[in-house]
Amino acid sequence: SIRNSIDKVNKDVSVNICRWAFPGTWARSIARSWRISPDIRPRWSSVKRIIDLNLYLSAYCGGGHYNDMDMLEIGRGMPRNEEEVHFGMWCIMSSPLMIGCDMQTIPEASLSLIKNEELIALNQDPLGLQAYVVQHEGEGYVLTKDIGRRRGTERAVALYNPSDSACHFNVPLSLLELGGRVRLRDLVRRCDLEPVSDSIVCDLPARSLRLLRAEGLYRTDPVAYEAEWAYLPCFDALGKVKHQVLYAANPD
């Protein structure tokens, strides 16, 4: 097989599986990443669809393995707000980042976005985790993940409005498992926000994202448990083999 041949070369080679959908847990033994969607296009409907497909695949990311959301379409004609959603969600979901535009003609605003060191650092966080959904009310989604260290006091948070109208967010800090006075930083605009003690409240316009780094005084116990976070050890998208249902922890 290709994998066996690569192993014989004794080089650090990254293998990506592309079958336009999450292939199954078997992919971890073969590849470092895998595509989870059809090919991306430089339009909002395509970006939104890929995010939708990856919202509940966080259990399969980690330990040096990643859900590949396809290349970046930054600098290819989408408006600023949609580009911020595109790049920000790719970063917090730990997707591989591959530039898909002509670097000689990319607009300055688009170039500054993909050069944002704080967003790149989020994507390259050593934990390599993918953000997961902790709140979905109306059209808005709230995603979070640990950064720096597991069960630490620092987390990344995305308030994501994919709809065509404004969306109100009220996110209790208990959902983010952070306690005390929580410091907030806007990673897209690279500025500090007012600290909060109870909840994060904001209104977002259509097709927009608020991407935050939140640092609390201490970590609190989880208050939400969702079946969509589960790791299914025998998941096989090919559907050729019937497996007994097993319950196991994520290997990472």
Predicted feature locations:
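Short, well-ordered alpha-helical packing segments
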Residues: 1-7
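Extracytoplasmic
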Residues: 178-184, 192, 198-204, 208-252
